[in-house]
Structures are given as structure tokens and as C-alpha cells.
């Protein structure tokens, strides 16, 4: 005990010495153990969310509420420069889903803090890594350095976004507690004069000048360097709290036995790099992105989706003293329009815990159990590493992390398989030290890929657990009653003991677990049970109540806080068992008012303390009975699938969307390619410069028309670049002469075209080139955003081009923003259908304009682009959340085809079946109207003269949930995007973009 007292005094002294602020506010402070927010130590349990990938602000609250319900107290947010600044000098933080004030407000309403990450560079598999796309012409100087031209380019962005972050920081009553500087920028040279050091200092100064006064953070790109820590060769540019990104899974979607080997060197890494700071993982693997041509889609990647990953990896981080953890991603969302960098396709599901459809995966449920534990386990926020290895158990097949809090004597033993990829069951005993001496805990079982946090001297409200040999989900204090929730897998043996108590009597309720007690030769009584299926309850004579819950049953256990503060104590939560989701709770007198979602009718059990006598579910009181141990039990309904009707997609109209291949097409209003120089770091292969960005066209399909005279030209050499998996075609005087379907591994390709089998004219021969676009590169690829898109060069064999013209989205970025600031220029490309707005609600498909009856199931019998249009009406039940999507099916023999899907004007899918893997495309409420008319459009690009068609296209539902969700407008998920201003209609202004 003397040693423990000495350690306790030493820890307090060290904490006092090392407790640090940024000198601007003491509302957020830190020491080697944790962050302190508003005077409270906080285990930061955060998830990454990219609001542009869910462009319906009301749905942001849905995600935040689900995060809060699953134990999260923070969200990490990138703010993408290119998303808010489509053209130089324009910054939009107000229109539609660009209105980020709603983001801050919803986070605060949900009760979660914000970690702001505004770059200027973000990465994130986002178009150009988030850098403004108007820099893609080379006008931005030396990107991500202290270069003066680049500095001048990004400064207005930080001035504007910085002020918004400052206004919403905790110092101004907002939710922002941390602000990240840049993104994964490696400090390769520790020198004060290094351009990266100067660059970091420039950004930090800019944020401070904008009023941001919360601590700065960084994120190291894996263990590749040691960057920006005040504790490691600090020559300038260091941040307040160093962070390390890690994606250690090494998992395979096609071989689930691959990988699953945890890293065990985080603790030592942080001790060597940032020993005066808490251990922070700004990006820890919540999933992984899938690329074009992948062998499987996210929904099929069982290795990434497994709850076992969350169980083992997130507890492994706890074992290494991590107290700030952000899961990347928590919710991935959708790369609608042209948000994606070329490394990903439309879906950004990321195999994240919360599915792209906003549905709860088992992985999220397991993640919740970790989050609820860290929420109330204050003893974790002051632990020292006592030891680690295989010597703490009766078998070397088990590995243990041993943490001890010198202030409270609480201990945490994180046990896992020594070989974490093992799928073999092991049973062993664990040696633990407690305030009452050493104990050997027997019969601890790990079923393959499983981990447990075994706690000792764990304080409850009115008593202390001396030890417990399974996981604590959470505990609550209800007046004089402690309620503890333990979870284990069926068949696993659990033992626990109270500290300083005589032998207690107890009563069992529910499915019997045959709890037994044994004192042996000590005054300590050990209680042992074998976990059965479902839930059992034990009430002890000291008033303590234990819920003994099977792990899978615990997936539907909830601990909604009774406060909106992100900091939640054991006295500020109640317990609910049964529903699909409990969003929040309020208590008025004896009435417990629950708001949540449910799929199927179920029993609901509520423990809220002795004052509680009635329960409301989504505003309606339900009949409840009180159990002998004090909970209230009733029944709630679910969604009625028979009330949901999903219409077929019929009544299609079709029109040619590539008349530009015909010589007679009038391109007099097109942009002339006449530049002979470029700022691009990439040299053009011919003149004039044909890089699309040099002419103000950044996103989407590009169309070129090149003319030449003479019949002696024998061929052409063209090089195009559109990003990974792009494809392109070339027509000569209306005839297809080159088809390059695309390759998932190719960013650019060359076409050597032979004209020998084609008729040329004496004058005005026309070469039409259509080039797809999968995004601008991140800086990990060559020159990043400055890698040109479009034609890199074009030459003739035996002649010269007399002119080149280019067409992209309507009016380029500037014109497209003027036409549609809500969806913004990243939504569209250069097809005639897109330029003229055929995809928009309110557009009339008139036969006089060339529209005829025609289905995408009939398709094209030659190369070209057809645009298909129809409408459908939904009448889904009010107060239902019915995630919807579009599913494509292609013929067994797939001809090269590229399809863009438009829903109410939003490009919400790129379907390329011969590359894959995506075939289904979720559409959120507000983009699709659940109780109104919807417009759907398809551009079908047949890349060969064999033509192309679909086998089927249908509207599908992913599930149905009766819900009490409300974003403040009383409509729940009945979000009419048109009425909310998210679906601007077609206007005559589109007609001029021919």
C-alpha cells in the first residue's frame, strides 16, 4: 500500500506539472493521460463523418444521433475547400448542404463535440484531396509548401472557414474542441528553414488570426516519420496534441482469414514521440475504401464488417493507453456527382460501422459496447502501463495489457489472443492484482477473434467491483441503486466480486444463469455464472443490480443520456433493452419519454430508477408493468412492411445525348482551345493546350471537337487522361474510330487511330472525342490535383488540326454555379443532357425536341450516348425511415457501357458494369422524395458499335423502421427536397448551353 500511495502522489504531481493549455483557453487542456474539457477528463470517442457525402442537412442530425446513441461523444469533420469554393473568389457556406452552421448546430443538439479538419489539404479520397479545383490549371504554385503563390491561394479559405470554426468553438459556446492543421503532412526534415515547417506555421498563424483558440492537432501518416510534436525535435510548426493515423487490419474481402494482426507498438511510439500529450489516433480503421474493379462490394466484405474487428482492435487501443480515438469512417456516405477522387467509385460506404444507407451494422453495435464502457470508466483516464505480454495468464496463447490507475488503484487487463488472427477458442486463468491482494481468475474464454477488458477495483456509485472477468458494458447509479451491465458470449463463464462486502444474498430473474457464490479461505465472496442466451438479471441484498447479457443481445442494449452535454456520468443515463435504436430520452416527473426507431414489434425494458412509473415511445404512452427489480417492461410496434409500396420504373422517354459526333452540329458557342502556354507542371504533348482545366472545365465528362482538312491524313495519335477507370471514345465524321473502355489501374491511355478504312473530306473533317472523368488526383499521385484532365495531346499523321473546341459542364465551373448553386458544379459534366438540364425536375421531354418512347432495357444498337427519363411517385408511411436505392442488372455478356444515374437532378451513381463492383446505389431522403413525385434520368454511353443495354433497373428498399426522428421541421424522414430547396428545377437559362 505504501508503494501505491507513492505512485498516487507521483501521478498527481506529474499531472499538475504536465497539465497544459494552448495559452488561449483553459476550457480544453491536456496531459499525458487525457484531454480535459470544461474541467472534466474525457475519453474522446469520435467518428469520422463527411457531410458533403450526405447532402441533406437534416440527415446530419440522424447520423449524429446514432453516433451519440452508440457511445460517441465527438465527430471528426473535414471541411473541403473545393466543395465550398467552386470558383476562385467564391465561398459558399449557406446554400443547401453547404450550410455548415447547421452542422455545428446539429452536433450540439445531439450532444457531441467536433474535431475540425479544414486542411487546406484533406485527402479523404475526395476530388483533388479537397484542394480547390481551380488550382488544377497550375495556378496554385508549389502545392502544400510555403510557396508564396500557394500561400496566397489558400489564405482566403482559412480566413473564412477559420472564422466559422472560431465562432463555433467551445470558447464561444460551440462544440469545436480541437482543430487539425493540414493532413498527414510528413516532417521529413527537422529544420526551421524547411518549407514544410514554414508551411505549418503559416497555417497555424492563419487559424489563430481567424480567431481559432482551441488546441491544434496533427495526424501522422502511419509510423513513417515523427512530425509536428513538441516532444520530438521541435524546430517549429509543432501542434499542441500530436496524432497518429493507423489502418492496421490488413484484411481481405475475398479471404477472411487474411490479416487481423493487431499492432502492439502504439504505446512505445507515443512514449518516444509525444510523451507529454495524451495518445491520440485521429484516424483509426473503421473500415477501408474499395476501388474500381474490386473483387467485391462493401456489403460483401465480411472481414471488414465483422464485429470481431471492433471488439479486438478498439480494445487493443485501450490496452495501450489511447484516450482519444477517431474511427475513420464512422459513416462513409456517397460520392455523388464528382466528389470522388479516382481511387474510389460512387459508394463511399467504407465498410463503416454505420452503413451508407444509415443502417446499423453489427460492427457498430459492438463498437457501441466499447463506447459505453469508456464513457463511464473514468479510471481509464489516468492509467500507467504496468506491463504487457503472455506471462499474466496460464497460457502463452493469450496476450495481456495491464493498466493501473495510481490514483484509484483501478486496474484494466485487456486480454486477447497472442496471435489475434487465430480463430481457435482458448480458455485460461488470469492473474490479477487488486487492493485486496492477488487473485487468479479462472475459466476465461476467448472464442477466436475476441478480446475482453477485465477490470479490478472498478468503482461504482455505492460500491466497488473488486474484479470482474468479463466486459463491463456500462453502469448507472439510480439513487441508492447501482446497476451494472456485463456482457459475454453464450457459454462463457464469468466471475466477479465486490470489494469490502460480506457474503450477499441475491435473487435471479429471467433466464436462470445459476449464479453461485464461493468465499474460499478469504473474506471475499466470488460470484460465478455461465452466460446463457438473452438476458438475465441478478439483484443483490446490497441493492446492486446486474444485467447479465449475451453479447448479441447487448447489441440492442442502450444507455441514452439524460443530458445533452457530451460529457456523461453514470448518474446521467438510463438503460433500455429491446429496440433497434434509442435516439434520446427525457424524463418529466415519473414519465420516461423515449425517442427511437424500431424494425419489428418487440418487448422493451426500461430501467430509470424508482421514480419512473410510465414510458412513452415516440410520444405515445405504452402499457408497462414493473418488475421485481424495478424496471418497466412493455411492448412497442415496428414497421409494417405491407404498408410500403415500391413502384416499378416504367414510362421511359429517350433522346440522343451525343449529337456532337455529327458534322452538322453547331458548336459556335463552344470554348475555343487556343492556348499555347500553360501553368501546369505537366507539359502538353501538342499545341494548342487541350487541358480541360485551362479552359475552366474541371469536373465531369468532356467533349472535344477537332477539325482538319484534306484526304491525305492517314491517322491520329491522341492521349487522354481522366483518372483511374476512365474510358473514352473517338468518332471521325460520325463513325466510331476508337473505343477505350477503361482500366481500373490506368489514369491515362493513348489511341493510335488508323483512318484507312474511313472516308475523309477535302475540308472540315471532324474528330469528336468524349472523355470520362473519375476525379482529380490526391497529392499521393504525381502532381495531384494539377494532373491534367482531358486531352494531353493530339496529332495527325500527314496533316494538322485547324481548330479544337471543348465543352464541359454548362458554362464551366462559373456558369454551372450560377445555374445551380445548390447542387453546385461538382454535380454535372459536359453531356448535352447535363448542359441543358434534362436531368432536372420540371424539365419537359417534348417529342418536338426529339424525345421518343424508349427504355434503357432496349438500349442502343450502336455507339453513342442516349438519355432516358421517367418519373415515379412514392407514398411511404409517415414516420417511417425506408432506406431506398436503385439497383442495376446487366446482361450476362456485358458490352462496355458507362451509365450515370440522376435522381431529382443529383448525379447519384456511376455504373460501369464491366469494371464494377457497384450495382446498387442508395439514395437518401431529401434527394429522393418519400411522399411525392421523383424524376430519374440515365445517361447510357455505349462505347462500342455493338451498343449496350440494361437487363433491369429497379427501385429497392433496404429495410423499414418506424421512427420518432425529427430534425426540427416535424416531417421526420418525409423530407421533400423540392420544398426544402434542395431540388432546384429546370429553367430556360439552360437552353443556351448547346
Swiss-Prot record:
One of its GO terms (molecular function) is beta-galactosidase activity. GO terms for biological process: polysaccharide catabolic process. It is an enzyme of class 3 (hydrolase). Residues 1-19 form the signal peptide. It catalyses: Hydrolysis of terminal non-reducing beta-D-galactose residues in beta-D-galactosides. Coiled coil: none annotated. It comes from the Eukaryota. Substrate binds at residues 78, 123-125, 183, 247, 350. It holds the Pfam family BetaGal_dom3. GO terms for cellular component: extracellular region. The active site is at residues 184, 283. Glycans are attached at residues 88, 272, 388, 407, 433, 500, 514, 521, 584, 600, 674, 712, 717, 757, 861, 969. It is found in: Secreted. Keywords: Carbohydrate metabolism, Disulfide bond, Glycoprotein, Glycosidase, Hydrolase, Polysaccharide degradation, Secreted, Signal. Cleaves beta-linked terminal galactosyl residues from gangliosides, glycoproteins, and glycosaminoglycans. Belongs to the glycosyl hydrolase 35 family. This is Probable beta-galactosidase C.
Amino acid at each position: 500500500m505504501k508503494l501505491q500511495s507513492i505512485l498516487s502522489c507521483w501521478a498527481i504531481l506529474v499531472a499538475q506539472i504536465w497539465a497544459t493549455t494552448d495559452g488561449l483557453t483553459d476550457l480544453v487542456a491536456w496531459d499525458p493521460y487525457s484531454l480535459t474539457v470544461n474541467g472534466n477528463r474525457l475519453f474522446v470517442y469520435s467518428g469520422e463523418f463527411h457531410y458533403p457525402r450526405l447532402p441533406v442537412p437534416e440527415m446530419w442530425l440522424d447520423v449524429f444521433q446514432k453516433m451519440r446513441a452508440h457511445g460517441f461523444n465527438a465527430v471528426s469533420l473535414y471541411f473541403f475547400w473545393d466543395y465550398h469554393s467552386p470558383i476562385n473568389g467564391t465561398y459558399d457556406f449557406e446554400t443547401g448542404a453547404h450550410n455548415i452552421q447547421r452542422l455545428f448546430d446539429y452536433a450540439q443538439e445531439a450532444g457531441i463535440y467536433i474535431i475540425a479538419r479544414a486542411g487546406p489539404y484533406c485527402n479523404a479520397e475526395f476530388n483533388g484531396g479537397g484542394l480547390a479545383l481551380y488550382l488544377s490549371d497550375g495556378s496554385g504554385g508549389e502545392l502544400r509548401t510555403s510557396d508564396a503563390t500557394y500561400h496566397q491561394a489558400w489564405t482566403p479559405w482559412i480566413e473564412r472557414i477559420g472564422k466559422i470554426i472560431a465562432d463555433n468553438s467551445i470558447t464561444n459556446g460551440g462544440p469545436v474542441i480541437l482543430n487539425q492543421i493540414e493532413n498527414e503532412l510528413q516532417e521529413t526534415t527537422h529544420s526551421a528553414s524547411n518549407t514544410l515547417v514554414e508551411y505549418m506555421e503559416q497555417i497555424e498563424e492563419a487559424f489563430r488570426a481567424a480567431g481559432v483558440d482551441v488546441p491544434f492537432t496533427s495526424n501522422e501518416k502511419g509510423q513513417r516519420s515523427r512530425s509536428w510534436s513538441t516532444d520530438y525535435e521541435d524546430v517549429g510548426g509543432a501542434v499542441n496534441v500530436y496524432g497518429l493515423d493507423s489502418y492496421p487490419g490488413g484484411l481481405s474481402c475475398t479471404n477472411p482469414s487474411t490479416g487481423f494482426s493487431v499492432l502492439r507498438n502504439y504505446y512505445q511510439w507515443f512514449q518516444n514521440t509525444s510523451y507529454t500529450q495524451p495518445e491520440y489516433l485521429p484516424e483509426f480503421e473503421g473500415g477501408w475504401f474499395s476501388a474500381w474493379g474490386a473483387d467485391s462490394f462493401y456489403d460483401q466484405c465480411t472481414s471488414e464488417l465483422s464485429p470481431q474487428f471492433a471488439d479486438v482492435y478498439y480494445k487493443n487501443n485501450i490496452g495501450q493507453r489511447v484516450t482519444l480515438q477517431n474511427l475513420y469512417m464512422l459513416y462513409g456516405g456517397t460520392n455523388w456527382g464528382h466528389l470522388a477522387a479516382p481511387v474510389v467509385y460512387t459508394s463511399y460506404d467504407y465498410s463503416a460501422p454505420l452503413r451508407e444507407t444509415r443502417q446499423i451494422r453489427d460492427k457498430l453495435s459492438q463498437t457501441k459496447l466499447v463506447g459505453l464502457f469508456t464513457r463511464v470508466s473514468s479510471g481509464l483516464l489516468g492509467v500507467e502501463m504496468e506491463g504487457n505480454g503472455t506471462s499474466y495468464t496460464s497460457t502463452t496463447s493469450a496476450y495481456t495489457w495491464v493498466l493501473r490507475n495510481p490514483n484509484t488503484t483501478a486496474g484494466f487487463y485487456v486480454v486477447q489472443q497472442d496471435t489475434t488472427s487465430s480463430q481457435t477458442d482458448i480458455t485460461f486463468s488470469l492473474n490479477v492484482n487488486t487492493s485486496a491482494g492477488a487473485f487468479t481468475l479462472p475459466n476465461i474464454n476467448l472464442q477466436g477473434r475476441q478480446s475482453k477488458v477485465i477490470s479490478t477495483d472498478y468503482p461504482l456509485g455505492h460500491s466497488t467491483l473488486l474484479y470482474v472477468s468479463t466486459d463491463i458494458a456500462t453502469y448507472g447509479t439510480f439513487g441508492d441503486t447501482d446497476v451494472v451491465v456485463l456482457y459475454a458470449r453464450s457459454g462463457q463463464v464469468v466471475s466477479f466480486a465486490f470489494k469490502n462486502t460480506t457474503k450477499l444474498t441475491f435473487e435471479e430473474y429471467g433466464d436462470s444463469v445459476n449464479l453461485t457464490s464461493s468465499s474460499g479461505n478469504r473474506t471475499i465472496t466470488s460470484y460465478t455464472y455461465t452466460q446463457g442466451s438473452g438476458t438475465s438479471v441478478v439483484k443483490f441484498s446490497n441493492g446492486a443490480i446486474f444485467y447479465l447479457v449475451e453479447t448479441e443481445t447487448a447489441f440492442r442494449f442502450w444507455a441514452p443520456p439524460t443530458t445533452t452535454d457530451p460529457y456523461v456520468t453514470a448518474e446521467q443515463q438510463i438503460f433500455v433493452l429491446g429496440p433497434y435504436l434509442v435516439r434520446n430520452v427525457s424524463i418529466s416527473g415519473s414519465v420516461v419519454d423515449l425517442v427511437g426507431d424500431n424494425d419489428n414489434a418487440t418487448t422493451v425494458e426500461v430501467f430509470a430508477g424508482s421514480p419512473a412509473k410510465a414510458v412513452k415511445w415516440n410520444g405515445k404512452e405504452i402499457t408497462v408493468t414493473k418488475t421485481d427489480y424495478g424496471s418497466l417492461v412493455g411492448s412497442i410496434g415496428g414497421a409494417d412492411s405491407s404498408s410500403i409500396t415500391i413502384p416499378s420504373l416504367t414510362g421511359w422517354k429517350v433522346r440522343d445525348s451525343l449529337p456532337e459526333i455529327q458534322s452538322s452540329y453547331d458548336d459556335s458557342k463552344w470554348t475555343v482551345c487556343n492556348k499555347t502556354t500553360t501553368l501546369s507542371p505537366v507539359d502538353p504533348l501538342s499545341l494548342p493546350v487541350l487541358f480541360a482545366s485551362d479552359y475552366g472545365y474541371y469536373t465531369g465528362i468532356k467533349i472535344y471537337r477537332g477539325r482538319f482538312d484534306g484526304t491525305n491524313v492517314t491517322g491520329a495519335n491522341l492521349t487522354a487522361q481522366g483518372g483511374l477507370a476512365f474510358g473514352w471514345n473517338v468518332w471521325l465524321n460520325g463513325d466510331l474510330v476508337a473505343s477505350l473502355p477503361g482500366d481500373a489501374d490506368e489514369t491515362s491511355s493513348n489511341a493510335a487511330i488508323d483512318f484507312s478504312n474511313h472516308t475523309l473530306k477535302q475540308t472540315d473533317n471532324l474528330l469528336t472525342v468524349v472523355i470520362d472523368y473519375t476525379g482529380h488526383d490526391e497529392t499521393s499521385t504525381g502532381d495531384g490535383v494539377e494532373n491534367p484532365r482531358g486531352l494531353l495531346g493530339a496529332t495527325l499523321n500527314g496533316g494538322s488540326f485547324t481548330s479544337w473546341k471543348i465543352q464541359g459542364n454548362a458554362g464551366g465551373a462559373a456558369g454551372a454555379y450560377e445555374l445551380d448553386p445548390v447542387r453546385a458544379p461538382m454535380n454535372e459534366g459536359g453531356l448535352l443532357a447535363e448542359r441543358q438540364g434534362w436531368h432536372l425536375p420540371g424539365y419537359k421531354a417534348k417529342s418536338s425536341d426529339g424525345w421518343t418512347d424508349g427504355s434503357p432495357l432496349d438500349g442502343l444498337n450502336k455507339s453513342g450516348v442516349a438519355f432516358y427519363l421517367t418519373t415515379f411517385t412514392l407514398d411511404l408511411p409517415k414516420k417511417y425511415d425506408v432506406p431506398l436505392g436503385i439497383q442495376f442488372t446487366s446482361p450476362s455478356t456485358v458490352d462496355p457501357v458507362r451509365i450515370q444515374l440522376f435522381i431529382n437532378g443529383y448525379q447519384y451513381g456511376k455504373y460501369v458494369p464491366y469494371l464494377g463492383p457497384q450495382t446498387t446505389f442508395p439514395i437518401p431522403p431529401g434527394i429522393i422524395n418519400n411522399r411525392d413525385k421523383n424524376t430519374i434520368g440515365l445517361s447510357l454511353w455505349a462505347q462500342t458499335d455493338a451498343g449496350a443495354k440494361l437487363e433491369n433497373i429497379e427501385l429497392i428498399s433496404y429495410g423499414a423502421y418506424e421512427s420518432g426522428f425529427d430534425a426540427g421541421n416535424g416531417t421526420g424522414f418525409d423530407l421533400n427536397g423540392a420544398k426544402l430547396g434542395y431540388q432546384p428545377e429546370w429553367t430556360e437559362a439552360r437552353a443556351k448551353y448547346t
